[in-house]
Amino acid sequence: MAEQKDLDFTYTTIDEIFRLSMGESGDYSGAKYDGNFSMSLEEAQKAKHKFIADSLNITKGSKVLDMACGWAPFIRYIIHERNAESIGLTLSQGQADACQKNGYNVMVKDCRYVKPEDFGTFDAITCIGGLEHFCSVEEWQAGKQKEVYRDFFKTVHDLLPVGGRFYMQTMTFSKNMIEFEELDVNAKKGSAAYVMALMVKEFPGSWLPYGPEMVIKCAEPGFKLISQSSGRLDYIETIAQWRKKFRKFNLKKYWLYLSLIPRYFTDMEFRHLVAIFKVSPNKVCFEKEVMDHYRLVFEKV
Ligand SMILES: C[S@@+](CC[C@H](N)C(=O)[O-])C[C@H]1O[C@@H](n2cnc3c(N)ncnc32)[C@H](O)[C@@H]1O
């Protein structure tokens, strides 16, 4: 599993740059264009929020747990558009500080270990782009991946009433995934071996499920699947829009980029993180169908 230090590396490092690029409560997960790429990124993210809130029957007063909440974009939506109540959990201190400053009820807590005694139970639960971080390469190599996901679904199960719904979206490996031994940061630029090696650098402590089937199977028998759709093409467009926003000039942001230069020369891992901004390995992985992306709605039975 990714630990707090890993998630601080991935998210807290870019906290201010992210907020200056995407807004204080920007989404850092695939939007929902449904193939209509004339939509703006903001419209497509809002369409995603609406889809999730509708799928989970979130209305006025619903109590919602947003696991792996990032900078709280979904929390912002359900508070303002549905008058719902929400608690958000993240493992990035920078995200939690920013969310609290913006008035959201967000804390640093590992969502995989939440118990009903902590906050009570919920009407609905979301985990948007969190599962990717729950199983490490080492756990996968030790054959523990399914156990990790089953334990997670057990946690969610205990927090919902029968009939309560859970939404998750997650990247998965897809039909062109290569062998782990082939991953190599020195491989040909643009190759699956190279971009997958960068992915592992960008998301330390993280490994993906092998297709949605693995996730759906691990959710049984406590959950039935209500709906499933691939967001792979939508994610490619999302990343293309993120790249423009990260590059858009803003004096403070460019100053922050400059302030990171010394670290670039002294920290090899950080140098790989910078390469990610140039290459967008996840976009290449989606294009090559090394990876896919799924939106899954579950109901507790
Ligand atoms: C890709 S971001 C998605 C953020 C947000 N859901 C969104 O859509 O913008 C992944 C998030 O997962 C969080 N995360 C990963 N593992 C976690 C864990 N075990 N407990 C709580 N949060 C976790 C990270 O801190 C980060 O906020």
Question: Where would I find each of the regions flagged by the language model?
Answer:
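Conserved class I S-adenosyl-L-methionine
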Residues: 61-68
